[in-house]
Every structure is written in C-alpha cells, then in structure tokens.
Amino acid sequence: MPRKAKEYPEEGEFVVATVKNIHPYGAFLTLDEYPGKEGFMHISEVAPTWVKNIRDYLKEGQKIVAKVIRVDPEKGHIDLSLKRVNQQQRKAKLQEYKRAQKAENLLKMAAEKLGKDFETAWREVWVPLEEEYGEVYAAFEDAAQNGMDVLKGLISDEWIEALKPIIEAYVEIPTVTIDAEFEITVPKPNGIEIIKEALIKARDRANQEKDIEVKFSYQGAPRYRIDITAPDYYKAEEVLEDIAEEILRVIKEAGGEATLIRKEKRIKKVKKRGS
C-alpha cells in the first residue's frame, strides 16, 4: 500500500481512507497513505443534507475519498469530510492513488534486483522523488520522456540503473491530442495542389519536433482536419498556432482563404519510445 513521505496530511488534502468504526455521532477512519494515522468524520460532514442514520452512508471496511479539514499534529487529531468531496475530486484522487500503487510496484521490482528491502527503497528513492515531484510516478514519467538523467542528484546512480529498464518497459507517457478543422479554398486551377502542398509542408515541419505528431485528413471540400499529439496541452496549442499561422499565410499569398475551426482535446497514453 503506497504511503506518503510526510507524517501528516495537510488541511485541504484529499486522502484515501478506510472506515474503521462507526458511531451515532461520526466515524473513525484509517488513512491508507499515512500508516498509523486515523481521522474522525463527524456526522455533519458525511453528507450535505441531514443524516438520520450514518450507516446509510458509511460501512465498516469501506474505502472512501475524504477531504482533510483540520490537522493537529500535537494532539494527533485529523478531521475529515465526505460531503466536501465532489465527483471530479474523488476521481482525481483515486487516479493519483492508482498511480502511486503502480509506482510502488515498479520500485519493489528495482529493490528486488538490488537485493534491498522496500523500506530502504522507500527511504532512498520514494521520499526524495515525492518531495521533488509531488508524486513518484510523475518522476518516472519524466524519466521515461526525458531520460534517466533527470533523476540524477535525487537518487543514487545504483537506483537509476536498476530503474532504467523497468521504467522503459512499464511507464507510459501521457499525451494530449487536440483536433481542429481548416476551411480552405483557393480559386485557381491548381488550387488543390496549392492546398495539399501547404498542408504537407506544415505537417512535416511540425513533425520534426520531439514528441510531436501531426496528421491531416480530408473531410470533404473545403474542410481539412488536423490532429496534433503532444506531451501536454500547451505544447499542442503552440504547434497548432504555428501551423495555422503558416497555412493562413501561404493560402493568402496564393489568393485563397483559410479559416481555423477549433474542436476538442483528448488525453491518451503511449508507451515510451526508447531512451
């Protein structure tokens, strides 16, 4: 079970918790990511409406995502809320927790290769990477995308060498794909050739950039679709802006007209493409 590097959660943090004991006035929960720590959820923090029977909402052994609303390390008190967690926040936290579980499994593989126990791995790798990146899997993604050298100075070369083949084999790089459409007309006998040449040049130039993939597809005159895949949304937007500027310039110089129509973005993951 993945655990945080810090001893206590912070106020406002979302945590994965397991219901331990239920009482008429509230419930005690163990914090999965903070071994040995328990939190209390008053019945007024269970649901936004009046709760007659807390057991209609919570069951012993149930795992939930809760929000930390108060922390007193001196007294060891942690107050939790369920009603202050919306569906989007719950989904994001569970995704983060799954990423931590995957990072833990990968680190265990590396520890086994080196003949070290997980406590040593947690201390020598997990703690420094979490402190630097906020989550360990984000560090692994950075290494997968930009090379293992990004971890130098954070963990030892011994760990870097052990993790390298594991990260290459198992870590996926998140990418964002955005799509848009161009409406292009060039009222000349060779108008189609002018449009085709403009699109090919823009595509080939963009594809020379690292981790960028641009595809055009014909949607039926005068519409042309573009799909841009990049490491993040901002880079995809930057590429689209550059391509649009180039296409609009070329088409205008040829005496035609071009209009960019925005569409949507999609997030996907791809396996690392070598190191």
Curated annotation (Swiss-Prot):
The gene is eif2a. HAMAP family: eIF_2_alpha. PROSITE patterns: S1 (PS50126). This is Translation initiation factor 2 subunit alpha. It comes from the Archaea. eIF-2 functions in the early steps of protein synthesis by forming a ternary complex with GTP and initiator tRNA. Heterotrimer composed of an alpha, a beta and a gamma chain. Residues 12-83 form the S1 motif domain. One of its GO terms (biological process) is translational initiation. GO terms for molecular function: ribosome binding; RNA binding; translation initiation factor activity. Keywords: Initiation factor, Protein biosynthesis, RNA-binding. Gene3D superfamilies: EIF_2_alpha (3.30.70.1130), Nucleic acid-binding proteins (2.40.50.140), Translation initiation factor 2, subunit 1, domain 2 (1.10.150.190). Belongs to the eIF-2-alpha family. InterPro entries: NA-bd_OB-fold (IPR012340), S1_domain (IPR003029), S1_IF2_alpha (IPR044126), TIF2_asu_arc (IPR022964), TIF2_asu_C (IPR024055), TIF2_asu_middle_sf (IPR024054), TIF_2_asu (IPR011488).
